[in-house]
């Protein structure tokens, strides 16, 4: 079974905008596809591989927990 974690797309978008990055710039920094960034941001809360949330958090210089939904 593949491990997944929830990510909050709105929090990703806000963190990206605070860092003054475009979706393409974030994708390049995180080593992800620009379409993946768009899907995450538009999905609200969605499930991703733990590696994806770590890549995004590192690229945004934030704690991975700050990108997860409050439960």
Segments predicted by a language model, with ranges:
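Short C-terminal boundary/hinge segments that cap the last helix of small helical domains
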Residues: 61-71
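Recognition helix of helix-turn-helix/homeodomain-like DNA-binding domains
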Residues: 32-47
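A short, Lys/Arg-rich alpha-helix, primarily the initiator
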Residues: 1-18, 65
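Short basic helix-loop element that most often maps to the first helix and adjoining turn
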Residues: 10-29, 54-55
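DNA major-groove recognition helix of helix-turn-helix
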Residues: 41, 52, 71
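Short, basic-rich loop-to-helix N-cap that marks the start of a DNA-contacting helix
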Residues: 20, 44-58
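Conserved hydrophobic/aromatic packing and binding residues within compact polymer-binding modules
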Residues: 12, 26-27, 37-40, 67
């Amino acid at each position: 079974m593949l491990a997944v974690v929830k990510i909050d797309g709105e929090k990703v978008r806000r963190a990206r905008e605070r860092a003054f990055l475009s979706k393409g710039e974030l994708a390049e920094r995180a080593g992800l596809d620009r379409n993946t960034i768009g899907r995450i941001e538009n999905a609200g809360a969605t499930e991703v591989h733990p590696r994806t949330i770590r890549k995004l958090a590192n690229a945004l210089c934030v704690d991975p927990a700050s990108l997860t939904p409050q439960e």
